[in-house]
Amino acid sequence: MALLEIHDLHARVAAPGGHEILKGVNLTLDKGQVHAIMGKNGSGKSTLAQVLMGRETYQVTQGSVLYNGKNLLELSTEERACEGVFLAFQYPVEIPGVSTSYFLKAAVNAVRRYHRQDELDAMDFLVLVKQKMALLKMDQSFMNRAVNEGFSGGERKRNEVFQMAVINPTLALMDETDSGLDIDALRIVANGANSLRSPDRAILAVTHYQRLLNYIQPDAVHVMLDGRIVKSGDKSLALELEAKGYDWIEKEVAQLA
């Protein structure tokens, strides 16, 4: 069953004269699946993830997006988050003065209130957090630190996946979460992402490199070029891109034009 259905999605920078970045994206992501989006810089990969999350710096000009049967484009960013969409940022920001513990507890309980569920009390929240911290090999001192303040690049990425594991979304969007990670950190982050895999959830991972896909096995790999998905395949496509680059795909697309 489809969790996410994107049809002919166009989007541009939301400013006077803003240029078009997405130029007709089509994609179907079923529950239980992991799909990877690959492509050169400037191909529209990260823009797609941010448009799906509702970032206001982009304006959708055409197309439709159905998420769990609902019109995703009609929902605010906050509503999308409460409906189970989560974006792990490429460049996680600092939130000085706000502890990770306070931030996460507020996020978890905001989702629970949205679904008319009781809020987690301090003890239940602590049990949940300890489980996820063990999974990601994180020290409990992280919880007392301000969100991402003074964190290394690897710590920020690990913290993003930790937040994702705690919030437990239905659709996880990972925007180059593997960039800048050494092999040990990559393995830990991938374990956190894999913990979300279930028949009711899906992951859309934006990445430059196939090495992430050694740990998060994708059901499909898509290549973006100039704001569109121009080729799809299985994991072997990612290996081919690693070996040959993107020039052959550009030539293939040019011949079909």
Model feature map: region roles:
Residues 173-177, 184:
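Walker B catalytic motif
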